[in-house]
Amino acid sequence: VMGKTKNTLLTWLKGLPKRWFVDGLSSMALGLFASLLIGTIISQLGQINALSFLSKFGDIAKNKYVVGAAISIAIAYGMHCKPLVVFSCAAVGAFGYDCGGPVGAYIAALFAAEAGNVISGKTRIDILLVPFTTILIGCLIGSFIGSPISQFMTWLGDVINSATKL
């Protein structure tokens, strides 16, 4: 039994780089596109007098909580998580984005999706435990890494701005 567990763990660890960086980042891009980018386009269309009703649609689509949720849901979906994990990631992404922007949502979603997947389908009370675990782990990760990530991204932006002025 120990050998099988060790092999399963090694297989899982070997798959993490593709799962987190290829699948996770490409899915994150889809979530950003489906919310922030499209929301911005809709908002711009709302600047036309005849289409002013679109402004509110765009504003909602590009709201930080909606963008965070879209990022996190897209990541969980791209990682082939079970439905309860995917849907629970909405709260994780909103929280992660609030704490650490898009990178905060990304990292919180990765940990939440993995944690939710570990227990999904293993209990009789999945309907309670899967969302609880997914949201709890994701929000804890988001709260720990959010502020440092936000500070780092601000610093990186300042460095890039300074470099472009040289």
Feature locations, PLM:
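Signature of multi-pass transmembrane helix bundles
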Residues: 2-166
